[in-house]
Amino acid sequence: MTYKECKYLIKSDLNRLTKVKWRGGGIKYLFFNASFRITFWFRIGSYLARQKGILFKLLYGIVFLIHKHNQYLTGIQLPIGTQIGEGLCFAHFSCIVINSTALIGKNCTIYHGVTIGGVRGPKGGAPIIGDNVVISSGAKIIGKVRIGNNVMIGSGAIVVKDIPDNAVVVGNPGKVISYNGKDHIQYFVN
């Protein structure tokens, strides 16, 4: 990841929360908005972890500690280096666990109590989540499953099978109840 890419990801995460520019209020969000604070330090840490040189390693150590502290404050386990696209938004926080090997597309909205977890063993793996996905409170996405684009996962749903594009999923186990997810997520993504 280049510095320019890191900066773009940070700005797109901020734009999911507000339309203020970085200099016009982004710093305020860094101090007072838990969602932006956790994603900011996650992006900076992910950038520094891929850099070479003693100065970058020293800075990474400091950022790692800041990020770890923010994980404790927010209750969001977001490992540095996890591959997550632009526009990540935690609408509410606490009790959120994201596997470090999960792949998450752009404009993902995650509510409290969500688990995006992997499974060990020969059939193991972690979820691959598409673009413009809303994961409602208490939902669990477990194992090597693919979640399509424009998907809405309802509160408390437990997803252990692949979900196609534009689906709305509810229940335990998660079942597709409609294919108008694109209509539902427009209120969360824009």
Tell where the protein language model's regions lie, with residue ranges.
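Terminal amphipathic alpha-helical/low-complexity segments used for targeting or macromolecular assembly
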Residues: 1-74, 184-190
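Flexible, disordered linker segments and immediate boundary regions flanking tandem C2H2 zinc-finger modules
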Residues: 180-182
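Left-handed beta-helix
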Residues: 74, 80, 85-86, 91-100, ...
